[in-house]
């Protein structure tokens, strides 16, 4: 398919699905289906799609997958059969999957430069969405995803889970006791959170790009133009794609883009900021290459009520608490200067329950715990930091208008154009 025909052809093919914007297609066809089990398709079959959690997720039935790399398509077919799914539909172009009536859930496992556009197109095609982190590569794309999910009545799940289950990386406890502490203001208010290796969170600066790569021929079995999609055209080099794409601004944001939403979404939840964003970003970082992601020494986010998040990139805050308020501090493993803290926490009421069963969310049309709205806000923290890195300075942000304050240079990174013919 020629590039200029992409959007028009997709909309023509997807038009038949506009009626399916309330209930999943599988449930609408339940009278002829062998079961009411929801069906799922994987868009992208790289490292994350190979994980046992995704291939082994039997609450839905995997029926399709795609990847612009033909070798990965063949690998996906083999892995699906190995995991008991039998023969599935597999292709290179994701639009073929969006046009299929037998797919209920689109699971986006691509590099982040595709997350926003695929989410919007999936919503327009009447599919529910399971998207890997970060939710989107830019704030503008995230805003558009929120609009598309709402307009089309879809259910959206962002795949980071530390606000509601499992351990909190290297912190040494779960988020729930921290939430109880914060809800009951045991630390006072406002609160500062420090995120870095000193508090148990690796910022993974190893995800940096190369600045001296020499263009190479595109492999015959790899559709590089489709892999780039909405990203600016750059000559092919294997380091720009597959397992090392995170080191380039066009596709992700290095270690901050990779791990930032995992770490910062629970912090946002603890600070009660699911419906807003920082009003100011400050940064200390070396000059950044225009193409390859580098590192930073410190990023500080400030909210309107005085709460702060500090990303410590060079371990300069040795001994710093993870959470600090006017009444107390908390370090990893729930160590604190508040006497008998664990006993106090044990007596506190439980936080409000969260909707953490995605299949139930889809069937009952109930918002998932981490959805397009609060997921957008935690992705915005990540993307504000990335904008500051690329600018080499801080800036003010309007969390209502979702733009920089009197700063066109910052807005050019917040709202980035897509490579023609791709549009949102």
Language-model-detected regions and their locations in the chain:
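Rossmann-like dinucleotide-binding domain that binds NAD(P)(H)
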Residues: 215-218, 225-305
């Amino acid at each position: 398919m020629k590039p200029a025909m992409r959007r028009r052809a997709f909309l023509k093919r997807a038009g038949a699905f506009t009626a399916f914007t309330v209930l999943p297609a599988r449930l609408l066809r339940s009278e002829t289906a062998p079961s009411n089990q929801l069906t799922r398709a994987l868009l992208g079959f790289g490292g994350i799609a190979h994980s046992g959690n995704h291939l082994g997720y039997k609450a839905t039935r995997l029926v399709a997958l795609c990847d612009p790399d033909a070798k990965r398509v063949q690998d996906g077919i083999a892995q699906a059969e190995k995991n008991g799914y039998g023969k599935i539909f597999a292709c290179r172009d994701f639009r073929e999957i969006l046009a299929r009536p037998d797919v209920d859930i689109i699971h986006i496992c691509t590099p982040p430069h595709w997350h926003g556009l695929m989410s919007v197109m999936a919503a327009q095609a009447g599919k529910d969405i399971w998207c890997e982190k970060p939710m989107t590569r830019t704030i503008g794309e995230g805003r558009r995803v929120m609009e598309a999910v709402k307009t089309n009545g879809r259910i959206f799940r962002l795949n980071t889970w530390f606000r509601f289950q499992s351990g909190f990386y290297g912190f040494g406890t779960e988020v729930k006791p921290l939430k109880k502490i914060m809800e009951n203001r045991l630390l006072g208010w406002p609160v500062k959170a420090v995120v870095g290796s000193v508090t148990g969170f690796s910022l993974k600066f190893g995800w940096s790009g190369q600045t001296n790569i020499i263009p190479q021929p595109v492999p015959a079995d790899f559709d590089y133009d489709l892999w780039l999609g909405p990203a600016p055209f750059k000559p092919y080099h294997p380091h720009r794609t597959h397992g090392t794409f995170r080191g380039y601004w066009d596709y992700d944001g290095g270690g901050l883009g990779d791990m930032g939403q995992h770490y910062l979404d629970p912090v946002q939840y603890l600070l009660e900021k699911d419906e807003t964003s920082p009003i100011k970003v400050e940064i200390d970082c070396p000059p950044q290459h225009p193409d390859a992601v580098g590192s930073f020494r410190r990023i500080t986010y400030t909210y309107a009520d005085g709460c702060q998040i500090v990303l410590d990139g060079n371990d300069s805050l040795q001994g710093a608490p993870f959470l600090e308020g006017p009444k107390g501090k908390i370090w990893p493993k729930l160590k604190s200067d508040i006497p008998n803290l664990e006993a106090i926490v044990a007596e506190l009421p439980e936080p409000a329950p969260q909707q953490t069963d995605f299949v139930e969310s889809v069937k009952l049309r109930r918002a998932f715990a981490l959805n397009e709205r609060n997921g957008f806000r935690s992705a915005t923290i990540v993307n504000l930091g990335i904008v500051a890195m690329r600018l080499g300075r801080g800036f003010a942000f309007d969390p209502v208008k979702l733009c920089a304050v009197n700063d066109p240079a910052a807005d050019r990174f917040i709202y980035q154009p897509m490579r023609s013919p791709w549009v949102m």
